[in-house]
Amino acid sequence: MNTKLWSHSESDDFSRRFVDDFSLDIEVIISSESMLLTIGENKKVTSWIKCSDNFYLGIDAGRNVVHLYLDKLTPSEVESFFEAVG
């Protein structure tokens, strides 16, 4: 995973800890109980990291996070997602 973004994490300048300007395409595939977010274009997952029973990270060959998979979502959580992005 590329950690260059966190090179200022030890700095006292709080604003330097975040990426302020970036452009990113995200495709979202939603079912009634799950969501798959694909970050960027033509990204192929080489392995999955299980973070919890319902959250997984898809990693490509360069060890970049290219997919987020959320499972066992409630209808309210899916609706909240639509409200947040709409």
Curated annotation (Swiss-Prot):
Domain of life: Bacteria
Function: Immunity protein component of a toxin-immunity protein module, which functions as a cellular contact-dependent growth inhibition (CDI) system. CDI modules allow bacteria to communicate with and inhibit the growth of closely related neighboring bacteria in a contact-dependent fashion. Neutralizes the toxic activity of cognate toxin CdiA-EC869 (the C-terminal 289 residue CT fragment). Does not inhibit toxic activity of CdiA from other toxin-immunity modules or strains of E.coli.
Subunit and partners: Interacts with the C-terminal fragment (CT) of cognate toxin protein CdiA-EC869.
Protein name per UniProt: Immunity protein CdiI-1
Organism: Escherichia coli O157:H7 (strain EC869)
Upper classification of the organism: Bacteria, Pseudomonadati, Pseudomonadota, Gammaproteobacteria, Enterobacterales
Gene: cdiI1
